[in-house]
Amino acid sequence: MLSEKQYLDLYQSSSRVIKKNSAEVLNAVRDAAFEDFRRLGFPSRKVERYKYTDMSAIFEPDYGLNLNRLEIPVDPYEAFRCDVPNLSTSLYLVVNDAFYCKALPKVELPEGVIVDSLNKIAAENPEFIGKYYAKIAKTDEDGITALNTFLAQDGLLIYVPKNVKVERTIQVINILRSDVDLMVNRRVLIVMEQGAEAKFLFCDHAADDKNFLATQVIEAYVGENASLDLYCLEETHYKNRRVSNVYIEQQANSRVNHNVITLHNGITRNRLDLVFKGEGAECFCNGCVIADKNQVVDNNTLIDHQVGHCTSNELYKYVLDGEARGAFAGRVLVRHGAQKTTSQETNQNLCATKTARMFTQPMLEIYADDVKCAHGSTVGQLNDAALFYMQQRGVSREEAKLLLQFAFINEVIDKMELEPLRDRLHHLVEKRFRGELNKCEGCKLCK
């Protein structure tokens, strides 16, 4: 309760400052979100979806917050070049929880496409933002989402109009920077109109060696016949705590490709809630996790088949070394009347040491009788016979271990449809297994 009380006291004492620096449409839901948090609090391990990670411990330390929206000095040209060779991107920066618009090269986007500050657009067009903001990210169902909603002051809006295809990948670099331990609360709102197509690459980095706590809520609306590719890559450091809740709503015949990659972190908790609202939609959800030392990565997913004739595919793979701890809980819910549903959920895990720990819980909950659904999970160690075979042919034990780990994780990397990113991940993962990569390789401030 101590950790909850400090956030309740914070809002009661600082709500005027928070609202002063935010658009009215964002403020309109704050008080209700605050009351939801007062009622729900931080989810305990008794809550099924949070049984593997102690959320109160993550939020208990005393972090600073930039409620007065003081400008954080950055040099985007020197610091934040998160390069993916051979991938042409439109580059945007979010520093802590604020959209950064200064001294960036002008980005040419198709007519009508918007990538801008959520707070800015909310002030300019409150009717549009009010139609979507905090609608599928329900504060009365999750304490973390409620906390983010009453504290968040800015973030990112991405809007793609009807039948517009964005050819270049939109790359968003989320940078954590501070001279003191800091908490940031970031919002992302993605609206894809009917027939729209776009690819997004979100890269999370920590530029300073401080204790960071980042909460993030992403709401994505994918219209009829629209296509959304979302790649989320985390390369922070061991002092970083990240809690990300992603909510996706799909209409008829839409397609979503959601990929979450964790290469460096401290404690990471990713939640994905995806709901099918129209028939003929499909989603592909992939997760790639590499963790060692005392790192923790917890992925929790819910795929909600509310209508029939939809397809979902999930593949999450973990490689855990040292005393790392991983968790995966994936629930596929097929509701009454959701006939002709097809679903495959797979979680495969490799513990490279005896001290690494993995918790896995794939779940199917089916209330329709004409479906094709399967799920499975495995947890194992390196194959001693394969190691021996390779050593007999002159391969050192360490090199053999690396090759087997790389072959194991390769399956999920190869499902990434962005070929340049796929090639980049092969390079980063190999260096990670060799112990040559301690944090982000591409950003100068991260060195």
Language model: regions and residue ranges:
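Conserved beta-strand/loop scaffold segments within soluble protein domains that form the structured core
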Residues: 106-115, 121-395, 409, 413-447
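N-terminal amphipathic, basic helical "cap/leader" segment at the start of enzyme domains
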Residues: 1-146, 315, 321
